[in-house]
Curated annotation (Swiss-Prot):
Reactions this protein catalyses: cytidine(34) in tRNA(Ile2) + L-lysine + ATP = lysidine(34) in tRNA(Ile2) + AMP + diphosphate + H(+)
Taxonomic classification: Bacteria, Bacillati, Bacillota, Clostridia, Eubacteriales
Gene assigned in the entry: tilS
One example GO MF annotation: tRNA(Ile)-lysidine synthase activity
Record localization: Cytoplasm
Protein's name in the database: tRNA(Ile)-lysidine synthase
Amino acid sequence: MKKKVIDFIKENSMIKNGDKVLVALSGGPDSVCLLHILSELRELLHIEVYAAHVNHCLRGESALKDEAYVEELCKNLNIKCFVKRVDINKISEEQNISTEMAGREERYKFFEELKNEYSLDKIAIAHNANDQAETLIMRALRGTGIEGLVGIKPVRDGIFIRPILILRRKEIEEYCEINNLNPRIDETNLEEIYSRNKIRLKAIPFIEENFNPDIVATLNRLAYSCSKDVEFIQEEVEKRFPKLCIKENHSILIKEEAFNEKEALLTRIIKKALFEVSSKHNNFELKHIQDIIALKDKGTGKQINITNGVIALNEYGDIRIKLVDSKKAKENKVLNLENIKDELDKNQKVVIEDDILGNYELIVEDLKKGEKFSKDRFIKSFDYDKISNIDIRFRQNGDKIIPLGMKSSKKLKDIFINNKIPKEERDFIPLVLFNNEIAWIVGSNVSETFKVTNKTKKVIKITFKGKEN
C-alpha cells in the first residue's frame, strides 16, 4: 500500500526533497493512516513531518480524548505536534455560519499560521477515494458542471496535498488495524443527519449492492477524466483571455467580441474576470454569469449588482466588471439639490450618472388632478416642495425609514430581512435621502414623510436606470 501512495505522490508531484510537510490530524482513521505512512516514508522521501490538531470543543470529553490521542501518537512517532483549542460554537454564532464552515475556516487559518511561522512547504489533508466518490455524488445532485465533477484535487495551490486520495476507506481501516494504530472514531460520522453521511451510509452501499459494486473506483475515474478535460478548456481560456479582456483601473473590461465566442469559453472567461476582480472563488453562480451575458444586450449605462460588492456595467456593448469600494461609495454624496435647483426649475429635468450608485433621471412637474403614478418599483414620485436637499448613498449603521402607511420608523436591516434581500446585496442597494432622511430604498420601500398627498402641488419623479427591472 505504501508503494501505491508513493507512486501517487510522484505522479502528482506532491512532494520534493527537503519539504516540510504538515499533516492535518483529527485523530480519525484517515488522518492517522496518512500521518503513519508519511512517518514511515520520511527517509525515503527526504522530508520532515509535522502534525496539527484543532480541538473544536464541540464534543466534550470525546474531543479531549481525541486531543490526548493525537499527542500520544505523535510522541510515539517522534513527530512535533501543534494543538489548538477553538470554541467553534461561539465563532459560528458570532459569524452567523454553520459549525462545519466555522470549523473548516479555523482549521485552515491555523494551518496557515503554522506554515508561515515554521516555513512549512506542504499541508497534507487526509481525503480518500470514498470522500472523492461522495463529493461527486453530492455535486451531481446539486447540478454541477464539469468543473464540479473534477471533485477533490490531489494538489491545490501547490501547497495542499492529498497523498491518500488513491486509497479506499476499507484499505485505510485495514492499515490502521494491521499497525495497531487504534484511531479515534467521531460518532457524528455515524449519524444520518448530514447529507454526506446519508450518501456514505445509505446511497453508496445501495448502489454497490444493486448497480455497481465498484462505484467508488468508477467515480474516481470519472473525476480523473473530467480533470483532464477541464485542464484543456482552462488552457484555452488562458490563451484567449488576454485577447478578449482588458485589465484597467482595478476592473476588467470584457470586449464585445468575447460574446461571440462559444458559450463554454465565454462563461469561463466571465468567471475568470469575476474571480480576478473579487479574489473570491466560491460565491459566483451560473445565474450571475447568465445575468452578465444578458446585460450585454441591455444598452449602454445599464448596471447590475453581482455579489461580494462586484458590479457589471455595460459600456457601449463592452462589459466592465469591477469591485465597488463600499466605504468610499458610502461617503460619496452624489447629488445635492441646492446645486441643481435652478436647472430643475428651468428645465424640469436632470440626469445623474454615477458608475457606483447608478444612473438617475429627475423630473419636476405640476401634479395633475387624478394623476396615476407608475407601479414600476424603479420609478417613484414624491412631494417636491417638502424637499430641500437630496443625497444618494449606500446604507450606514443605524439607518431607518418611516415606511409608507406607518407612523414609526423601522431599521433598514429589518426591512431587508422582511423583503428577503440576500445579505451580500444589502450594502449595495442605493438609498435616496431627502433632508438627510431616507425617502426611498431603491427598488423597494418609500417613506411616509415625502409621499404625494392632495395638498401636493409639484412632484419630483425619480427614475433609477442603473438596475434592471
